[in-house]
Swiss-Prot record:
Pfam families reported in the protein's UniProt record: IreB (PF06135)
Superkingdom, natural source: Bacteria
TM spans (from-to): none
Disulfide pattern: none
InterPro entries reported in the protein's UniProt record: IreB
Organism for this UniProt entry: Clostridium novyi (strain NT)
Name of the protein in its database record: UPF0297 protein NT01CX_2279
Family: Belongs to the UPF0297 family.
Lineage, uppermost ranks: Bacteria, Bacillati, Bacillota, Clostridia, Eubacteriales
Length: 84
């Protein structure tokens, strides 16, 4: 067994961004599967903070509540403005 002599670097921001993207994708899929317009529902949630805009289906409401709304907006703006 060889020992890696290189220092590993942990990027907390990248991991947070990946988690946010993953949760948004899962919530999006759950909303679509239930017949909702995901954009309208997510906008309603982001504006009001009311989690009932997000379906309970597949645990989507619990997932979205793991994120702060400002984190979601940050990720959406990064994607929209193509800033990585």
């Amino acid at each position: 067994m060889s020992i890696n002599e290189n220092t590993m670097e942990f990027d907390i921001q990248k991991n947070k961004d990946d988690l946010t993207r993953s949760i948004l994708s899962e919530v999006n899929n759950s909303l679509k599967e239930k017949g909702y317009n995901p954009i309208n529902q997510l906008v309603g949630y982001l504006i009001s903070g009311d989690p009932t805009y997000i379906t309970n289906y597949n645990g989507a409401r619990a997932l979205i509540r793991k994120l702060e709304r400002d984190e979601i907006l940050e990720e959406v703006l990064k994607a929209y403005l193509s800033i990585k």
